[in-house]
Amino acid sequence: MAAKDVKFGNDARVKMLRGVNVLADAVKVTLGPKGRNVVLDKSFGAPVITKDGVSVAREIELEDKFENMGAQMVKEVASKANDAAGDGTTTATVLAQSIVNEGLKAVAAGMNPMDLKRGIDKAVIAAVEELKKLSVPCSDSKAIAQVGTISANADETVGTLIAEAMAKVGKEGVITVEEGSGLQDELDVVEGMQFDRGYLSPYFVNKPETGAVELESPFILLADKKISNIREMLPVLEAVAKAGKPLLIIAEDVEGEALATLVVNTMRGIVKIAAVKAPGFGDRRKAMLRDIAILTAGTVISEEIGLELEKATLEDMGQAKRVVITKDTTTIIDGEGDKALIDSRVTQINQQRDEATSDYDREKLQERVAKLAGGVAVIKVGAATEVEMKEKKARVEDALHATRAAVEEGVVAGGGVALIRVANRIAELRGDNEDQNVGIKVARRAMEAPLRQIVANAGEEPSVIANKVKAGEGNTGYNAATEEYGNMIDMGILDPTKVTRSALQYAASIAGLMITTECMVTDLPKEDKPDLGGAGGMGGMGGMM
């Protein structure tokens, strides 16, 4: 085992604090409407320019191992805030830096670190309750656009695009961000249920100009099995031909003579047919087939529940207004399913999502909800260069997370004002002893830090403006973009309650642990062993050949 380097007490805390400040100082220059960019060098490709706090934090590794420990702990604050709310990483870092700096000053002055931490925790619990009281619901498109605009660093087009996307696919809908091909940002909405499976044979194509299959008011046969024998299909095909409607077959697979017969029927014009593989694999495929069945008012033909393909009737078929199939995707538009049954299915999947343990499962369940609830929106980010594209895409993703958080828990006044108001509201809070009271003061002082940093980044004097804002009431604050005072909500400067809450809780949690640190242990750097030097020739052997 490698030898260790151990530091105690003040020596350890000074080193740790230096690391905290290096990382936090790099991150906090990005805060607010007049925050600056940070350029990150990459081992390959062009440097990345970003205003995203967590992206900056993730890049920082310090040479001194004790300083690096401090930096890594603050990095954890930014990452946790990002995971919980998708935004607020810079605010969380600024809060953590303030708590650690003020807290360690108090420890150096002889306060008990454990009581300090208890005081900080008490203040944060009280502050979160007050934040919830200040929170107002965020339901209309205007408020959603404002939240998106603020989070995307005052880019109004991004806020408007996100609000449009949410209006079209619902607040539960899936909205994804992709790199576009032009200079303009675009919104592409896929209505209905779309899944990643295309037609099984190009002979099904009936729109050669687009290379797609379009079926108007088709019957939809859902089978949880491979279909290779055409005899199983004959009763269904005859019934559909009599009804004079097209047929879409969604099965585990359609192969061999069954597929050949379907192609021949289509080419001869006897009946319009298209076949696609069912989406997903294993249990997820079964669940998605059931989703499609509920959406289209059909039944999944499965031997597990005693249903056989030969005995299937038109009553077992699902129906939709229109189906469009390309070589890669199938889209079912306006299924005939009962609204109440669809809502019940959405509730059931949401419950599964809340209980899911892995991010992958949660994401897949959320996609299923969106497909049932109304569709998928894709925001295509436009930019002139790849460097700008990456920076802008990161901002749009942040803005999207922020708007989701706003819809979930509501909004509070932005620009650091909500935390100032909360700090005033808990002014009378007291701990069990004087050291805890100092901890409460440390937390309250930290709640001013985001506003002070926003003002400093705008080139103004933080103390003057912070005192003016503190003297105000309600949502009155300072708009750093226009350099004027006013009602932050009316000016459209909003922060999602969830983002502010998460930033405060994670900052206090990790900063509190750092204040109570008494010892730090790390590996000693390995010393390079000296080279053995060139091995000399063996003496006395020169005459040998």
Curated annotation (Swiss-Prot):
Chain sites annotated for binding ATP: 30-33, 51, 87-91, 415, 479-481, 495
Signal sequence, renumbered to the chain: none
GO CC terms in record: cytoplasm
Compartments it resides in: Cytoplasm
UniProt keywords, alphabetically: ATP-binding, Chaperone, Cytoplasm, Isomerase, Nucleotide-binding
PROSITE patterns: CHAPERONINS_CPN60
Gene Ontology terms, MF aspect: ATP binding; ATP-dependent protein folding chaperone; isomerase activity; unfolded protein binding
EC number: 5.6.1.7
The reaction(s) this protein catalyses: ATP + H2O + a folded polypeptide = ADP + phosphate + an unfolded polypeptide
InterPro entries hit by this protein: Chaperonin_Cpn60_CS, Cpn60/GroEL, Cpn60/GroEL/TCP-1, GroEL-like_apical_dom_sf, GROEL-like_equatorial_sf, TCP-1-like_intermed_sf
Region named Disordered: 526-545
GO BP term, example: protein refolding
Biased composition (Gly residues): 533-545
Main location: cytoplasm
PANTHER family noted in UniProt: 60 KDA HEAT SHOCK PROTEIN, MITOCHONDRIAL
Quaternary state and interactors: Forms a cylinder of 14 subunits composed of two heptameric rings stacked back-to-back. Interacts with the co-chaperonin GroES.
Function of the protein: Together with its co-chaperonin GroES, plays an essential role in assisting protein folding. The GroEL-GroES system forms a nano-cage that allows encapsulation of the non-native substrate proteins and provides a physical environment optimized to promote and accelerate protein folding.
Family that this chain belongs to: Belongs to the chaperonin (HSP60) family.
Name of the protein in its database record: Chaperonin GroEL
